[in-house]
Amino acid sequence: MFIMSKTLLEFNNLVTEFHTEGTTVKAVNDISFTLNKGETVGIVGESGSGKSVTSLSAMRLIPSPPGKISGGEIIFHKKNGEKVDLLKASEEEMRSYRGNDIAMIFQEPMTSLNPVFTCGDQVLEAIMLHQKIDKNQAIKLTIDLFKKVQLPDPERIYST
C-alpha cells in the first residue's frame, strides 16, 4: 500500500553564507523546519534576518559568488513519494522544479512584475518556460489561472 507523505519540503540544518571583503557572514545559520502539503507558512523576521535567503536557498538561486549554501539539506517530497535533496540536484533538475513544483512570491511587487509588460505576458512567459505547451494553450492556462485566483475580468487583465 502506498502512503502519501504529508511533508512537502524539509529544511534540515541549512547554512547559507556570503563571503565579502575578507569576512564570512552566515545569513542563515542552522535553520530547520518542515512545510506540509496544504500548509501556508509565513517566514517573519527583521530586515536582513535571512527570510529571503532561506527561500532563495530552496530554489538554489543564491548568487555565487559571493553566496554559498555551505551546509544542511533541503528535501523535496515529490508527488510520487520520491525524496530529492535539492542541494544535490542537477541544475537541469532544478529548472524543472522551479515554477512547476516550487515558486517564490516576493513581498515587493516591483520585483515581481515589470510595469512595462502586460501581466498576461509575464505570467505567459513563466508558463512557457516551464511547460511544454504552445502559446495558445499557455494563454488559455494564464487566463484560467487568473480566474482561479478570482481576479475580476481575467481576459482584460491578461492584456493590461
Q: Model-found features: residue ranges?
A:
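ABC transporter nucleotide-binding domains
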Residues: 2-160
